[in-house]
């Protein structure tokens, strides 16, 4: 099925909210859009093939070189819109939830929940900052709802983008700054030389506004 506008993105709530804001702002009696949660490779593939016009992703100061090379090889370019610092998402009842900041060492005894990228995915493709660090307890999942439920049920944690819109997930989760020397760069993928227009341009403008509003350091 052909869509009037389609976006693919990593598993972030600010993607969903930006898409919803765009649809509401445009209105109309009829429309045919698509929003796709994907792995990092899935986002790349969707934009490269034209399945989606844009792909919302992030890279870090540590992964930028590898990701930019992968984007370039696929005929894509990354447009940075904002920067943020990583934060740890924990259950509201977690014993470390009131810390002023946390290190990965302090979290070593707790299950680490993350998004599965596939067994052959490069470390740079993880959706969590410092996702390549070894953990004694880790669980991979493929959707946002399962990730949130597992964090709460197992008293676990994940590392978020630092964009706090929607992260509370019904007040079950809280975030604490992660003590790490890494910066997150958030933006979108497009085909080289392409310029978003129409609905895509509205989406990008709304995305930039949301990122600037909710980014935390």
What are these regions (language model features)?
Residues 26, 174-217:
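A late-sequence structural motif
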Residues 73-79, 84, 149-194:
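Beta-alpha-beta core module
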């Amino acid at each position: 099925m052909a869509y009037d506008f389609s976006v693919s993105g990593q598993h972030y709530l600010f993607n969903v909210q930006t898409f919803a804001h765009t649809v509401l702002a445009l209105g109309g009696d009829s429309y045919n859009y698509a929003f796709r949660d994907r792995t990092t490779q899935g986002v790349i593939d969707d934009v490269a093939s034209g399945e989606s016009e844009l792909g919302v992703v992030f890279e870090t100061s540590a992964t930028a070189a590898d990701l930019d090379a992968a984007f370039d090889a696929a005929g894509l370019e990354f447009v940075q819109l904002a920067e943020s610092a990583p934060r740890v998402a924990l259950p509201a009842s977690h014993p470390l939830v009131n810390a002023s900041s946390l290190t990965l060492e302090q979290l070593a005894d707790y299950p680490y929940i993350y998004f599965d990228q596939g067994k052959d995915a490069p470390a740079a493709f993880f959706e969590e900052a410092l996702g390549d660090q070894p953990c004694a307890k880790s669980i991979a999942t493929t959707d946002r709802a399962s990730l949130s439920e597992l964090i709460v049920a197992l008293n676990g944690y994940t590392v978020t983008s630092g964009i706090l819109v929607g992260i509370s997930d019904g007040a079950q989760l809280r975030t604490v700054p992660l003590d790490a020397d890494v910066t997150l760069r958030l933006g979108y993928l497009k085909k080289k030389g392409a310029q978003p227009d129409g609905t895509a341009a509205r989406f990008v403008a709304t995305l930039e506004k949301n990122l600037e509003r909710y980014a935390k350091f």
